[in-house]
Curated annotation (Swiss-Prot):
Protein name: Large ribosomal subunit protein uL1
UniProtKB keywords: Repressor, Ribonucleoprotein, Ribosomal protein, RNA-binding, rRNA-binding, Translation regulation, tRNA-binding
UniProt keyword Nucleotide-binding present: no
The keyword Transmembrane helix belongs to this UniProt entry's keyword annotation: no
Gene name linked to the record: rplA
A molecular function (GO) term: tRNA binding
Length: 235
């Protein structure tokens, strides 16, 4: 732990208490990702919303143009011919009532759960298990669908679901330290555009409050979100 602490302090010393230009910020986070594994790069967006009100909640998906840099395990709850379709599309776990029972019993070795509409009455009883983990299928995020092949392909290619937590903060993983700075910036722009495009109808006053990015083991870096928005608007 001592070496990690020293490394973190050294990395933290390179970060100034200011909002960095977007490309400068991702480059600095990359430079400070010095762990012996490929660190995940995350964005933390503080928004001016209060999610306890339904018209100030944010839950949506973002398609990262440069991918996520990681493989995800997808489970699909369906029946009939859709079982073979889901397996052919690459889902790791596929089943009907038996899979529902397995999940209820604690089988959670998947990162994303997709369900066909006809199975949602069965899936509904898993709310207590899936809800706290953010895994409950939802039509708004494309995880309740009859087109399981397309859904699986999209999520495998880099589509991510995210939501604002109780404090109004959005946490999104948008790449790996091994990505180029330009690719990380492209993904970060997609996150920003998605957050703006899905602004809750009840949001009042200043929507964006702050944006920080960080790597798994590195210090956080503040990003000038206005400059990020300007980059997107210029395209």
């Amino acid at each position: 732990m001592k070496s990690i602490s020293k490394r973190f302090k050294a990395a933290q010393a390179t970060v100034e208490p200011r909002a960095y230009a977007p490309l400068e910020a991702v480059s600095l986070v990359k430079a400070n990702a010095t762990a012996k594994f490929d660190e995940t790069i995350e964005a933390h967006v503080r928004l001016g919303i209060d999610p306890k009100y339904t018209d100030q909640q944010l839950r949506t998906t973002v398609a990262l143009p440069k991918g996520t840099g990681r493989s995800i395990r997808i489970a699909v709850i369906t029946r009939g011919e859709k079982v073979a379709e889901a397996k052919a599309a690459g889902a790791e776990l596929v089943g009907d009532e038996e899979l529902v029972d397995s999940i209820a019993g604690g089988q959670m070795d998947f990162d994303l759960l997709i369900a066909t509409p006809d199975m949602m009455p069965k899936v509904a009883k898993l709310g207590r298990v899936l809800g706290p983990r953010g895994l409950m299928p939802n039509p708004k995020t494309g995880t309740v669908t009859t087109d399981v092949t397309n859904a699986i392909n999209e999520f495998k290619a880099g589509k991510l679901e995210f939501r604002a937590d109780r404090s109004g903060i959005v946490h999104v993983q948008f790449g790996k330290a091994s990505f180029s700075a330009d690719d990380l910036l492209e993904n970060l722009k997609s996150v920003q555009e998605t957050v703006d495009r899905n602004k809750p109808s009840g949001a009042k006053g200043r929507y964006w409050k702050s944006l920080y990015i960080t790597s798994t083991m590195g210090p956080s870096v503040e990003v000038d979100f206005s400059a990020l928005q300007d980059l997107s608007n210029a395209e």
